[in-house]
Amino acid sequence: MSNIDEPTGVPEPARVESWLRTLVGFEDAQVAGVVALTDGLSNVTCRVKLTEAPVTAAVLRIQPTRGIFEPYDILRESEVLNHLAGTAVPVPGVLASESDPRFLGAPFLLLEFIDAAHMPAPEADFATFAADLPAFAAAVASIHAIDWRAAGLDFLGVPSSAAEGFKGEVEAVARRMSAFGCADEPLLNRALTALLPTTPSGRRLALCHGDPNPFNYLFRGQQLVGVVDWEQALNSDPRSDIGQLVSLSHLRGAATYGPPSENPFVQLYEASTGERLESMELFRARWLFQLGVVYHGWKVYGTEPWFSWAQVEDLLTRSLAEL
């Protein structure tokens, strides 16, 4: 019998407890419950309620076999979190990591539980979303300001230039197209043909979150207390993170399509950093391309996308026309 509840991916409490008791300090731990946290769309992420343990709650993240950000390496995420501990970016502490798949069927992490709410989707609570936006922009800027070499994050890979980083990101998305059943999709191939030979203007390399969507930023009131989901972290052009957020703002209806310089997040980010973001049309197109591939990936793996293919067609077509 499987140790995983197949429909949800949630492991049986007894199996988690058995593993926990192998850890120093958790020898008498009891698992009172394992509950799926439903906001994540890649790693299986659960809240574990504990008694007779150093903490009363923790987060369990289990590496998936397949998904929209494949290939996965959750132990890499653990290393990112350990290197970010003590920096200006608040992240959950790593309580333990496990590479042996015999326990829960795949490698996994046990993380500190941060009792805080993530930013809401703008269509669900625009007032709170707008109130959190300045702190959110400042948080993304603070990630990009980290001295990633001093923090020991060069293990993430160091492209020879920001332009090479951009190309590598496009190629990584293209490698998923066959598995996602969209290798022959005309619009995505047109985007790939346009993006691959394009060289963005010079820009510094920075630590990029890789998936800076608002659901990964935790707030108490309007104070940021945690940044989670670092599976896609990389050293690249920081405009990559901004391009994702501009693209998501269009898909969620938080900002109308227009010059990126008029996007509220771009303006707040620029105010926080004192830098002007150039060539954002290119980075918007690159992320609309990726989100088009993600759309097909979700379909393949049985998740109904929250945005439509018609939206992708409209936005990506307009974006490519600007290049």
Question: Predicted regions span which residues?
Answer:
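Activation of the activation-loop gatekeeper triad in protein kinase-fold domains
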Residues: 228-233
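ATP-binding pocket architecture of kinase catalytic cores
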Residues: 35-187, 200-204
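Juxta-kinase regulatory segment immediately upstream of eukaryotic protein kinase catalytic domains
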Residues: 1-27
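Active-site activation/catalytic loop segments of kinase-like enzymes and analogous catalytic loops
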Residues: 239-274, 287-304
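Helical subdomain adjoining the active site within ATP-dependent kinase catalytic cores
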Residues: 295-323
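Catalytic-loop of the protein kinase fold
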Residues: 207-209, 214
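Conserved protein kinase catalytic-loop anchor
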Residues: 205-207, 225
